[in-house]
Every structure is written in C-alpha cells, then in structure tokens.
Amino acid sequence: MFKYNRSLCSSALIAKSQIRFYRLKRAPLNYASHIPEVLNKTIIGPDEPEKCLILKGKTSEEIENNLLSNKKFQEINPLDTIQETFIQYLKFCNETNFKRSNKNLNRLKKTLESKDSNSTVKINAVFNYLLEECDLEIKRLNTTGQTQVYNEEKGNEDDLEQSIMNDIFRSAQEQFEDQEGHIPLRSTSFLLEILKSFNERFNGIIKPKESITEMVTFSQLAQAFEVVKLIPVQEMKEKGIYLVGNLLYGTGKVRLDPINESFYIESLLVFGNYKAAYSLFITNKDKVNERWWNELGLMITLRSNHLRNFRKLLAETDAKYSTKYSYLSPRVTKLSIRKYLSIGNVTEANILTDRFIKLVEEVGIIRMKDEQEELPTGVKNFQNEKHATEFLNELEIPSDHDYISIVDFHLYKRNIPMAAQLISKYMEIPGTTQEDAAFLLVKTKLNMLKDFEKLRNIFAQNKDYVVPENNVKMLQEAFESVITKYNTNSPIYNELLFENVSALTKSIVLTDFLEEFITKQASGQWMELNSVSRSRKFNGLLNILLGTGEEEKAYNILKKLEEASKKSKTDPDLLYNQFYSEVNAYHYAKFVEFYSLQIQNMKAQNTPSFRKKEFKQKVKSLLKRMQESEVIPNAVFLREILNFYDSMYDFNSSFEIINPLLESKQQVSSESSLSTSNPCRFYNRRIITKPLYHKIWSVYCHYYHVLQNNSRILSKKSSIVKKLIKRQIKIHPTCHPRVLFQMTAENGEILPDKTFSKLIVSTFMKSGDLEAIPAILTFLTKKFDLNIDYDLSMYILKGLKRQYLRDISNISKDACEYKLRKAELMNNESILKNIPQGTNQENTISHLIREILIFIKWKEKSDCSTFLMVEDAFKELGTEFTLLEELIEDVNKLKIKA
C-alpha cells in the first residue's frame, strides 16, 4: 500500500489535498507504474510483504508563505472579524445616520481596536454606548415615529457591504419582532439581551454568584435603570426594570430610593416574584412612612393572594392615614372586591363596595371621555422627591371605568342586590346624563335583556335599599335609546336575547357572542373581526345550538370549522381569512360539556343508563376528530373531558390524562418563572388553570371515595357498587395528594375559594391522610385568609365521626358488637365535641386539630403518641401552628379506649 498525503494547515487558511492509495497487484502483469520510485519493482511476489512509500512534499509553513507572498492570500485574525461584524451590527442598530450616533460609534470603535483595552474595558465601553443609544433611540421614536425612522434608515444605505449586512440583520430582526410583537427598538432590545446575560452570570444561574461591579459600575446600572423606565413598550419596560433591579439588589450593597424602588417592586409582581416584592415593601415601610407606600403594599398582598395580610395592612393604613372620606385608592378597591368575590366572601366585598360608594358620593367621578383627554402623554418629571411624594399621595378620583368594573364584578359573581344598588346610585351621581346611563348598560351588557322589565326585576332583590323612581325612569329611557340604536327590537334577535340577569351572566362566552352578533353582524363588519373574536362567536353558536337540543346542526357547524382548518393548511393565505374560523379545542369542549350534562340529567332523573355507552362513543369520536384536525387540547377541553369521565366513574381514562399532565407541570414548575434572566408572565407560568385544578381534585376525591374500605356491616349496597367500580380500575394516580396540594396552592398560584378548600379537605379525609389535615387547614387560613365557618367545621367533624364508625365496624365481629362499641365511643365526652357558633377562627382551628389528633391517637391504640407524621406535614407545607405542641401534650393526657 502506498499512501500519498500532502496537507497545509495554518491559523487562517486550511487546504488539504486528496489522499490517494496505490495497491500493487500480486498477479503477473505487464504493467509499469507512473511513480518513479517503483518503476523497477512493479510486481511483488506472493510471499513478499507490502511496502509503504510516503512521498515528501513541501512543509505547511513553506506552502503558507508561498500563498501569502505569490498568490495574494491575506492572513485573517478571527477576533478582528468578529469585532468588525459586531461594529456593523451596532451601526445597523443605529437605524439612521445621525451625527451623534455616528460619533458615539466611532468612539466605541477606537476603544475596541485599542491594544490597551482589556475585556472589562471593552464591555464597559459597549455598555456605555448602548445606554446612550437607547436614550437617543427612544427620543427619536417619540419625536419622528416608527415609519419615518425606517424610511430614513433605508435611504442611507449607500455602502454596498453595509447594505448587505443590514439585510441579513434585518431579516433576523424581523423574525424576532414577529415573535415578540415589539416596536423595533434595536439598541434597546440588544441592551435587554446583555442585561439578561448579566443576570445569568451574576445571579448564580450559569456560574457561582459574583459581583456585577466586575463588569460595570453602580453609576452605569443606575443610568440603565433610568433609561429602561423610558421605554415606550410596556412589556419591554417591565422586563428592563426587572433585569436592572435584580443586578442592583443582587450586590446587596445598594438600595434604590422609594419611588424608583416602587417601579422595581411592580416588575417583581408582574413576573411573579411576590416574596421579594413584599420583603422590599415591609423592610422600607417604617422608613418611608407615607400613605402611597402602604397602598403599594396593599396591591402586593392582593396580587399575591395574601388576603389576611391585606386586611391587617388596610386596618393599619386607615388608622394611620385617616381621611375625611375613608379614602382608598380605586385600584386597590377594584382588585380587593374582585378577590373577595372570587372566593365567595360577599360580606367583605360588600363592605369595600359601600366604602367605594361613599367616596363617589363625596368626590364624584371622572367621565371616561374626560379621563382620556387628561391622560399624560409622557413620563411625569418632578423637581425633587418631595414633589413626587406629594403627587403620589394625592387622592385619586374614581372614573367611570372603575365604577362600571365594580358593577361587572358583582353582576358576574351573581351578587345581584349589590349590583342593582350600584346601578341605581350611578343615576344619582351629579352630572349623569342619559348618555352616561346608556354607556353603563352597554358596558355591562344589560342591554341584551329582552325588555326593561327583566332589568327592573333586579331592583326588587335588595330589600334593604329602595330604588328612587327617578333613577328607574332615567335607566328605562337609556335602555330604550340603546334598543333603538342597535335595532334589537327586530324579530331576529327576539329569540336570542336573555330572559333575565341570571341567564345573562351565566355564560360570558355566550354573552360576548350575542354582543358581537348585535354590533357587528347587522353592520356587515363580520370579516373585520379578528380570528379570536370570530372563533368565540362560533363557540357561542355551538353553545346555543347544543343547549337547545340542535345537536345535528351543531355537528354541521363543527364540520365547517374543521374544513376551514384543512383549507388554511393547504393554502396559508386562507388562514384567518374565511367566514368560518379554524376549529380549536374550545369548540370540541362544548360537545363534551353537553354530553356530561346529559349524563348528569340522567342520574338526577333516575333514567336508564343505556345511553352512557352511546355518549362515550361520541366523545371517543370527538377525540379522533381532534387528532385528525391536529388540534391540541387546552385547559378548558381537559377540564370538560375529565368531567365527562368522572361522571362515568371511568378512572382509567381520567388518570391517563391527569398523570402525564401533573408530571409535565412538575417539570415546568412555575418556580422556574422566577428566573432572573428570562421571566414569564402570570398566564404563561400557569399551565393548569383553577377550574382544571378543581376538576383534578374532584377526580381524586371520587377515586379515594371508591377505594375506601367500606364497612362489612354498614352500607352493603354501596360496598357492592364500589367493588364493581374498583375492579375496573387499572390506572392509579402517580401524584400524591400532598404534592398536588403544593402544586395547586404554591406553584399553581391558585386562590382556592371556600368550595375548593372543602373539596381539598374532603380528598385528604377520604384518602385516609388525616395527618396532613391540620397543616392543610393552617395553610389555608394563614395564606388565603380562608374563613373556617360553622358549616365547614361540622363537615370535618362529621367526616371524623364516619372514620370512627368505619373503623369500629371493621373490627367488630357482628352488628351487636358494633352497636356496643359505637355506644361506648359516642358516650365518651372527650371526643367529637361540637363547636359553638360564633367561635373565633383561632379557637375553631385549635378545636378541629385537637379532634384530629385524638382520632389519630385512638387509631394507633397508643397511650402517648408522638404525632411525627402531623409535624412532617407542617414541615412539607412550610407552615407552622404555634399551639401544636400544647395540643399534642393535652391529647396525650386523655385516656381513650380503642
């Protein structure tokens, strides 16, 4: 074998010739090699070994020198090339050839090319350059506008190489802008990427924690904070403030002044870092000592769902900063009312609403059109901190928008009496005209009632408030003017309008559908609606059709929607440009919901269940159609499909969905959204919604109910049914209820209401994990300010009683022994004591925990129990109960016969 190999390698140029192999044939052959060295030995005998001849060429250094000297090759320094491309990109980011920008760029170029500049100096120079360019970029955008800046940029590309590079950069930039949906603030976007990189490096994500001051100074970071506050795009501004704030506070050496710190706190709230936000507020509360700072704290507690802390801080604020009108910022009022209504605490919501009404009666409101005229066009500048504090402490007058939002909250949470009172009081506000009343009706969608009598009926529901006749008269005139404007007297609308307010507020989707239908369809503006709005209209149409029993017509509509999806995939130009919108998971969810309701109706009426198989087959067919249409299930669809399987006691299908869903949630925990470099907003962090979590807990509760060991003596019929269901269960939950609770309450950022909390407690009781319930109750009351009322307390005590009886039944030989054991247990005055009505929260919690501890001790048949599993549950949830040790000691003193 002969090997011929010649290669040339250098730092800038690599050239490698082909390797050619020559094998001498062993058979006799009249052949002469073209290689001089083997002319005299062309044939190798059979017994002779192969020989390898390596041909020597010029060295790599000789060839490299020859190419550089004679062939006009040029040696390239890779670092210089990267630096040159970087300068070209910065020039592209300048957008236009402004003299000041060019001057800044030339200064930076000199610094980067200087041999005396090390990496730190270069990074420092780049950061300074970007800060100045961002400031200029924002000012240009505010003065010249986006289109003019772009046109000037295109007109100034004289240099061919720069023009080509700009096309490359612009192509990448356009893809980024399409994804982000931002105005092209190129230097600003680049600065945010650098800030993101700094966060990754200096906040312990990539490397161990270091100091940011190794790269940039505090002065530069302070300047960066001022620059990002001016960004006109809200999302970019919030992210910029978040990133710079993390770097400043990450050093542990500096703290912003209260006003600037409030900007950083707001960004922490936006990106879900509630603990850090509250910590900054509470550590500066006494030092700042201003009402506006307390209002900021109130917003933090509300947005982080710490309603108990909200109540405490509100009481403190009222006592410390009392005003003539019991003033509370409209922003705080709106959010607090919405939060309390969402957990079903109507009493607290009504108290806050009454407070809002009194404020409006004293100071009036700002009309929407007037408010728009007075909105500031830019950032407000102050002469000093004193003027800024005075501005922040000014009483904010509520607007029409604030008032109508609160009416909406009460309407759609079915607190009709308070909503009616608000509507009536609105008519009494000085300066209210018929046009203003009509505006309220349209915004609350009350104009979609069939006639005014349906609206008049809501005023009769509030017996504590008598509506003046003048208010009703003005409202009626406004109602009639709206009907005339939208022509809803037409027969086509008559069958579609709502019979009463309850029907109006029952389905927001349906209400939105009718609103869009009335305002757009009649004017011929259907195709001007965006794809989401049209999709919602069809969703509402499906809802109406299925609700009225028109199943076949609903399937015809679904078929059209599926056809629209197929057409848009074949021809992308048709996407969102067809009369029928593309099918999505919401459309399929309506059908599944319809079949679930059918099964529930069959159970309620005790009708034969032979149609269950038919419904299950239809749902299976829907899933197949979804797969064929490549529609990805969303949280709404998953909730409905789980509801359907749950109503069928089909736990196999239920946990086929739940198990992988919870596993993916654990992998993409919302704690990762607290990343300092790439933060996520609320709705992006929460991949499982509150209704879906509620349904998952419902399935768990029913599952453990079926798995409970029923008494051999009691509930024989129930035991037979459970055994039949139990035999069919092949797939079981992989996520423990304790883990599910942590995912729901902590990582899921869910605020459970009373019904949800009762479901959680019920699940733990049915699963037999009574050791966790003391920690669960403590967590719910401490974080979510849940009111453990008399009904919930009795529910827990009755559940404990059932546990006692079930265990007694299982250890009894016959019914006679069971009765004796039951009588002995029930006569024991130490257990299952009722809680007197009116007992305060602390005593109620203590009583319930004590009863649970007694049951655990009774079940363990121990004279002195350590209750380690109870304490472990408290540690798992990161909460504590100060009286736990005292209760344990008290319970261990009791003598309870097992």
UniProtKB/Swiss-Prot annotation:
Keywords tagged on the record: Mitochondrion, Transit peptide
A molecular function GO annotation: translation activator activity
Transit peptide boundaries: 1-31
Main localization category: mitochondrion
GO biological process: mitochondrial ribosome assembly; mitochondrial translation
GO cellular component: mitochondrion
Superkingdom field: Eukaryota
Protein's cellular compartments: Mitochondrion
Note: Present with 396 molecules/cell in log phase SD medium.
UniProt protein name: Protein SOV1, mitochondrial
Gene name for this UniProt entry: SOV1
